[in-house]
Every structure is written in structure tokens, then in C-alpha cells.
Amino acid sequence: ENYTPKILDILQQKHVPATFFVIGLNIENNIPLVKRIYNEGHEIGNHTFTHPNLEITSDDRERIELRSTRLLLESILGYSTVLFRPPYNTDAEPKNLYQMRSLAVANNEDFISVTSFIDPNDWEEGVEADSIVARAIKNQKAGNIILLHDAGGNRSETVKALSQIIDYFQKHGYTFVTVSELMGKSRNQVMPPVQKQLQFTEKLDYIFFFITFIWEHFLHGFFLVAILLIIFRLLFVALMAVLQHKKEKKQENQPGEFLPLVSVIVP
């Protein structure tokens, strides 16, 4: 939400297409942004719903993750996706049986797994834009897909690095394309439109998700206002207490102001 719009602005300015692999939870919380990604000509892939480590996730859990995210995309955009990028280490190259198993599950769900070898590790804490650019350039011969992150933490350095990465590779004869074009396919082939007989159901799903989106943002704003009012009330009470304390102190220090009653008893 904080960095994706800035990245989209840069891509639009540079006339560069990209493929965004999105998490279901982020889709649910950023419906207008997901629409913007698609409407500006980019592609969207599945990155599971909650970003679990698929090496230690059951097959059934993975299927639910993939299907939920796909259903959410279909209900919002009217288009599905066959592109899938697994979370964590599996996104580069499977190195063990568990990683292979997770890719097999995705394949059985009719997904095409997309991996990446040019990974500048922009997610590392404290990494600077210059380092991200240098790593991308250093590994340019390792593959043909550059992996960058727009969520999951502070991505301000990624935003700074993006323009430099684009400028360098274009200057050296590279052309940026989407994953579908890299595969020799069209966007509609990797993001096929929802079948007509399912469109009514998808519209109902969209209405439900949109109401949920509005409600969550309303609650967020409501609680924020409530917290601010509580803080304001506490500050007001504290201020009044300080003023009252000063007033009482001032009265104590003024001689002759206080004249208590005196009773005289004559036997």
C-alpha cells in the first residue's frame, strides 16, 4: 500500500511492464490498488494467501491458499491467473523433495510456477539502493527474471533502486517484458477471463469482498478516531489537574486569606 503506487508510477514513467505476484491478504486489503495494477497493463500472479513456508505446509493447506487467492482475483478483476511464485527459498530453484512437492501441488492446480535467479535480496534489513542495484547488475547473467519486493517491510530503498536498474539494463540492450511475453504467450492466456457461467457467482464474491474491504477500513478509521479522542481526554484531564493544583498552591501561599472560625467557651 505504501510502496506499490510509487513503483507503479515509475513503471508507467519508464513504459516498463511488470508481473506482480500478490498475496491474498494484501489483495483483500488493497482492492483499488490491485485493479490499478491490472488496468495499467501489468500481469498478476498467485503468491499464496498468507505467505506460508510450503516446505512445511500440507498439500491441502497449499491448495486452499492457491484457490482462495485465485478466487479473490477472479471476483475483483473478472480474470483468473495461472502464474504462481512460491514463497521463500522455493522461488529460485527447488533443492529438496519438499520444495518439489509444493511445486507439484501447484502444477496439479493448473498453475505455472515462475522462479527467479536474479535476486538482489532487497528484503534484507538495512540494505541500501546502491547495493540492490549492484547485486542486480552482478547477477545479470544468472537468469532473465529480476525479483524485487514492494511489500513485507520498508521498501523505500527498492523504490530508489528501481529506476536505476531499469536505466542500466535498457542502456545495455535489455528489454523489459512480462512473464507471459517471456513465455511466448499473451496476457489473456496467463490471466484468462472468468467463464460466463461463473461471472454471477464471481460478482457476488466481489460484493462480499468489497463490503469486507470497506468495513475493515471503517473499523480502522473508527478505532483510530476513538484512540485519538481518548488521548485528547487524558491530556485535557491532566491539564485541568495541573491548573487546579497550581490554583490550590497559590491559595495556600496567600496569608490572611484563610480565616477559620473560633469558638470561645465561657464556663
Where in the sequence are the language-model features?
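Catalytic domains of cell-wall/extracellular-matrix polysaccharide-remodeling enzymes
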Residues: E28, P52-Y168, Y174-T175, E181, ...
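Juxtamembrane amphipathic/hinge helix adjacent to a transmembrane helix
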Residues: H172-F210
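Active-site beta-to-alpha loop of glycosyltransferases that engages the nucleotide-sugar donor
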Residues: V266-P267
